[in-house]
Amino acid sequence: MKASEPVRDLVMIHGAWQGSWAWAALIPKLEAAGFRCHAVDMPGNGHDRTRPEDVSMAIYMAYLRGVLDGIGGPVIVIGHSSGGIIASQLGEEEAKRVKSILYIAGMMLLSGMKFAELVADFSKNDPAALGIVPYLAWSRDRETSTVKPGAARKIFYQDCSNPKANAAAKLLRPHPERGRDIAARLTKGRFGRIPRAFIEARLDQSVLHKMQRRMQKLVPGAHRYSIDSGHAPQLAQPDALAKIIGRAIAGLLD
């Protein structure tokens, strides 16, 4: 790719219990705007043979490096929800290939910090900060957790139409706890140099808006954009989100 050519390849990282399907409504909008979308299925989410007990950040990074190798050029990484932690680590490890990171209601945290720490802090005074946690069903060995459809509709998809919410809730899969209990290890010289944007979901019931604001204070420097949606704007408002993503990328790569 010539230096003057814009970066058009988007690596899209889903959150817990989800898969590449989570981006299905958004991808055509982004492709119409000239982007090439690479929605991934993270190891251990039910689309490969990775055992839940084997999931780790190292396995995630090895998989994503393969994705980047296949693309063969610079990329923009988009992380939704817990996919934000993975996006941060990918930026750290592949700082030359990752040209910017976008967080969509994403977990943008300090080096070594887990999202559970933020939840523990906020839930002292606001039980709603627990988000989906009280609704989780655990496997007997507690290696995986599952979100039941009713809980998904209430916490993740409350602003989606009933058909959309029901369809998405049925697609959720057991998620490895070792892939949820992760933290990125970041440095100022690598991750810290990558331009970032944070797209807030102001009506989010999973990652409350005030928690999103706290993360932006903890890890300052991201350009802020907002959308009046719940936790999954890519499903509830794909047209509006695609426009915001386009503006965010243009602003980051100017």
Which residues does each predicted region cover?
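Conserved alpha/beta-hydrolase "nucleophile elbow" surrounding the catalytic nucleophile
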Residues: 14-16, 75-84, 201
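Active-site loop/oxyanion-hole signature of alpha/beta-hydrolase fold enzymes
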Residues: 36, 42-78, 89-93, 116-121
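Conserved alpha/beta-hydrolase catalytic His-Asp/Glu region
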Residues: 141-189
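Conserved serine/cysteine hydrolase catalytic core
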Residues: 170-234, 238
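Post-His helix in hydrolase/transferase enzymes
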Residues: 235-249
